[in-house]
Amino acid sequence: MSNTDYQSFYDNFTPAVIEEQLIGSLKEGFNVCEEICDRWADGDRVGLSYEGITRPASQHTYAELKEKSARFANFLNSQGIGKGDRVAALLPRTPELMVVILGTLRAGAVYQPLFTAFGPGAIEYRLGTAKTKLVITDAVNRSKLDNDQGC
């Protein structure tokens, strides 16, 4: 986008421009997962291309992401997670992280990123400040939560 194009977009921007593109509405609300995943889940359209360092590259369709994130959202609901609850993920950048993010949004919860480079103190501070209800992690990062009394 050129500077001229950007300036024109900026000068003419209104919320109505965005709302025209949404399944839901800004006033009534919308589900972010439906907007960024479900609406594209027709056929074999690729929604995520993963280029791994420690594991093989892979591609994942929107339909696959929709199905997996729906299962994860159901899991969250079974754990008592609902609208507005904070769900953190302490995971590497993998397709599974995207499923956690989408499933959290699908459940109406708030996704809270925790970067794997954070130490235990930084993680504990963020979890406490946000009043996080659930942390999703893997075996590699689990020890970073050992001293957190809420985990």
For each predicted feature, which ranges?
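N-terminal presequences and immediately downstream first alpha-helices
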Residues: 1-24, 133-137, 150
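A short N-terminal helical cap/helix-turn-helix that marks the beginning
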Residues: 2-9, 26-48
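Short, solvent-exposed loop/helix junctions and linker helices
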Residues: 27-31, 59, 117
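Short, flexible, glycine/charge-rich loop motifs used to bind or transfer phosphoryl groups or to couple energy/partner
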Residues: 36-39, 76-78, 125, 144-148
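Short, small-residue-rich loop/turn micro-motifs
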Residues: 41, 50-52, 115
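Residue-level preference for short coil/turn positions at secondary-structure junctions
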Residues: 42-44, 83, 131
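Conserved AMP-binding/adenylate-forming core of the ANL superfamily
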Residues: 47-102, 119-124
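Structural core segment of the AMP-binding/adenylate-forming
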Residues: 102-151
